[in-house]
Amino acid sequence: MGRRRVKRRINIPKRQSRLEKRFNCPVCNHENVVQCTVKKTLMKGFANCSVCEASFACDANKLTTGIDVYSAWVDECCKR
């Protein structure tokens, strides 16, 4: 008598959602107009609104992404 064969499940990797690169402006409240960039050579993060020309700059490290720069800008706006 033989053993029953066991079906092996094939591991299908889950797709990771992409991080957003365009955000809402905390100054003029337009949607998808803020673009955040991180200059790793300068160790600075920049956020610029294309409608109201508002801008923000902050210090960055090697792990900083665009969402980190945007959240720092929103935190700075909430403090005022």
From Swiss-Prot:
A Pfam family this chain is assigned to: Zn_ribbon_Elf1
Xref: InterPro entries: Elf1, T_Elf1_sf
Protein name: Transcription elongation factor 1 homolog
Keyword Acetylation: no
Entry-linked Gene3D superfamilies: 2.20.25.190
Coarse class of the protein's main subcellular location: nucleus
GO cellular component: transcription elongation factor complex
Family classification: Belongs to the ELOF1 family.
Keywords: Metal-binding, Nucleus, Transcription, Transcription regulation, Zinc, Zinc-finger
Presence of keyword Secreted: no
Protein's job: Transcription elongation factor implicated in the maintenance of proper chromatin structure in actively transcribed regions.
GO biological process, one term: transcription elongation by RNA polymerase II
Species of origin: Encephalitozoon cuniculi (strain GB-M1) (Microsporidian parasite)
Entry binding sites for Zn(2+): C25, C28, C49, C52
Compartments where located: Nucleus
SUPFAM superfamilies: Zinc beta-ribbon
Gene Ontology MF annotations: RNA polymerase II complex binding; zinc ion binding
